[in-house]
Regions:
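A short, Lys/Arg-rich alpha-helix, primarily the initiator
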Residues: 1-20
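Helix-turn-helix DNA-binding elements, focusing on the entry/boundary residues of the two helices
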Residues: 14, 25, 41, 56-59
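Residues in the recognition helix of alpha-helical DNA-binding motifs
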Residues: 17, 31, 47, 76
Length: 78
């Protein structure tokens, strides 16, 4: 049976998708806020560095912003 990797990769995958889309953290935060997801710069930074758990609503919003499937954030967890 494969071991499941720590949730560390979720934050890394969020950061990877942000880089691939050419966004800064501030741009992502602004888009999240426009979508009704109130998030500060420090909170967003904590999500990317795995110092805070992400909410499902935030994950769904990020998938819309990055035009990707939610599964992208779970790559390399297995």
């Amino acid at each position: 049976m494969q071991k499941i990797r720590p949730d560390l990769d979720i934050g890394r995958n969020i950061q990877r998708m942000r880089y691939l889309n050419g966004f800064t953290q501030d741009q992502v935060i602004a888009r999240l806020n426009l979508m009704g997801i109130p998030i500060s710069k420090s909170t967003y930074a904590k999500l990317e560095t795995n110092r805070m758990n992400i909410k499902v609503s935030e994950l769904l919003a990020l998938a819309r912003i990055f035009h990707c499937d939610v599964g992208e954030f779970f790559k390399n967890l297995l």
